């Protein structure tokens, strides 16, 4: 199932791999930035990859923070889909890439890890020197009073509030919806969203939606790590989201080398000292 979400790539070139390894190896304070591509081998699709990305394969569009806060229909669409996809997401396990970076950390092979992912797989693999730039989807937070509960606890509340909803879309014997399946228009109508247990406010997965401000403390940490590092390695990100791109651009403006591993173009290709269009696991196995 995991391979379903991994984009097609070209055959490995041993000389390119050796050169890449040699160049990255000269950086003693390496800042690593990971994106959705590092988790595709765990069965979690990315967004923009040709033929397999969620935004390229389906009619799915990102939900904007302002719409989420203003529109009940938008919140119903967000939570109904999250409810149906949660079992698959919750069961996702770290893959070779996550464990490799955890081992790199233990061996002091890099300075810091910034992930744009919200799947928590780096933490599950044992990473500790990490900033989850866009939050963590394994918990849910009130937008009014900062009350927090686990995503699984909230799933239980969603399940209780919406008896029979899952059975409309998930076939008997099937535990969850395919990650790239779009719900029919209007199917979210009537979906009930439990309120905050503390103040009755709106509950939202503890992730940064499009149009939402990033956590200022995390921004400061990332800026500090860029200043401290002397090179950047990006893994599995197109850097289309501005927050990730700005980190790389910040390092580039300081004349620090940029190394990229991503299947397909990225926003920072022109900045790259060297780029490989290979599967991340194939590269990390050689490093």
Swiss-Prot record:
The segment(s) forming the Deacetylase sirtuin-type domain are 10-287
Q: Where does Zn(2+) bind?
A: 142, 145, 196, 199
Cross-referenced Pfam families? SIR2
Extent of the signal sequence:
none
Q: Which InterPro entries match?
A: DHS-like_NAD/FAD-binding_dom, NAD-dep_sirtuin_deacylases, Sirtuin, Sirtuin_cat_small_dom_sf, Sirtuin_class_II, Ssirtuin_cat_dom
**Main EC class the enzyme belongs to:** transferase
Report the co-factor binding details.
Binds 1 zinc ion per subunit.
Where, by tissue, is this protein expressed? Ubiquitously expressed with high expression in the pharynx, body wall muscles and gonad. Strong expression in a subset of non-neuronal cells in the head.
Q: Where in the cell is it found?
A: Mitochondrion matrix; Mitochondrion
Gene3D superfamilies (UniProt xref): SIR2/SIRT2 'Small Domain (3.30.1600.10), TPP-binding domain (3.40.50.1220)
Q: Give the EC number(s) listed in the UniProt record.
A: 2.3.1.286
Q: Which cofactor does it need?
A: Zn(2+)
Entry GO terms, CC: mitochondrial matrix; mitochondrion
Task: Provide a Gene Ontology MF annotation, just one.
Answer: histone deacetylase activity, NAD-dependent
Give me the residues that bind NAD(+), please: 35-55, 116-119, 236-238, 262-264, 280
For the keyword Mitochondrion, the answer is yes
Give the UniProt keywords, A-Z: Metal-binding, Mitochondrion, NAD, Transferase, Zinc
Q: Which reaction does it catalyse?
A: N(6)-acetyl-L-lysyl-[protein] + NAD(+) + H2O = 2''-O-acetyl-ADP-D-ribose + nicotinamide + L-lysyl-[protein]
Other comments?
This protein may be expected to contain an N-terminal transit peptide but none has been predicted.
Q: Which family does it belong to?
A: Belongs to the sirtuin family. Class II subfamily.
- UniProt xrefs under HAMAP family: Sirtuin_ClassII
According to the record's subunit comment, the protein's assembly and interactions are: Interacts with pyc-1, pcca-1 and mccc-1.
What is the role of this chain? Answer: NAD-dependent protein deacylase. Catalyzes the NAD-dependent hydrolysis of acyl groups from lysine residues. Plays a role in oxidative stress resistance. Might promote neuronal cell death under ischemic conditions and cell death in touch neurons induced by mec-4 channel hyperactivation, possibly downstream of the insulin-like receptor daf-2. Might attenuate the reactive oxygen species (ROS) scavenging system, that eliminates ROS in ischemic conditions, under dietary deprivation and when glycolysis is blocked.
> What is the name of the protein in this document?
NAD-dependent protein deacylase sir-2.3
The major lineage groups are:
Eukaryota, Metazoa, Ecdysozoa, Nematoda, Chromadorea
Q: Which gene encodes it?
A: sir-2.3
């Amino acid at each position: 199932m995991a391979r379903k979400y991994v984009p097609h790539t070209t055959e490995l070139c041993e000389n390119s791999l050796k050169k890449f390894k040699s160049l990255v190896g000269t950086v003693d304070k390496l800042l690593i930035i990971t994106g959705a591509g590092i988790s595709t081998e765990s069965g979690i699709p990315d967004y923009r990859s040709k033929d397999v990305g969620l935004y390229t394969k389906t009619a799915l569009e990102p939900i904007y923070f302002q719409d989420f806060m203003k529109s009940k229909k938008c919140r119903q669409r967000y939570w109904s889909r999250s409810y149906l996809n949660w079992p698959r997401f919750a069961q996702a396990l770290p893959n070779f890439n996550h464990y490799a970076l955890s081992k790199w950390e233990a061996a002091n092979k890099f300075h810091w890890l910034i992930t744009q992912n919200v799947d928590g797989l780096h933490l599950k693999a044992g990473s500790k020197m990490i900033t989850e730039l866009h939050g963590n989807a394994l918990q849910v937070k009130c937008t009014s009073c900062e009350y927090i509960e686990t995503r699984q606890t909230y799933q239980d509340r969603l399940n209780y509030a919406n008896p029979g909803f899952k059975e409309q879309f998930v076939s008997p014997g099937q535990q969850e919806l395919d990650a790239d399946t779009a719900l029919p228009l209007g199917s979210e109508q009537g979906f009930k969203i439990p309120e905050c247990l503390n103040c009755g406010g709106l509950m939202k997965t503890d992730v940064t939606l499009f149009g939402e401000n990033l956590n200022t403390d995390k921004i400061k940490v990332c800026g500090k790590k860029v200043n401290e590092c002397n090179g950047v390695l990006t893994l599995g990100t197109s850097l289309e989201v501005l927050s990730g791109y700005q980190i790389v651009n910040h390092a580039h403006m300081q004349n620090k080398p940029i190394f990229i591993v991503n299947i397909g173009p990225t926003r920072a290709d022109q900045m790259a000292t060297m780029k490989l269009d290979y599967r991340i696991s194939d590269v990390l196995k050689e490093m």
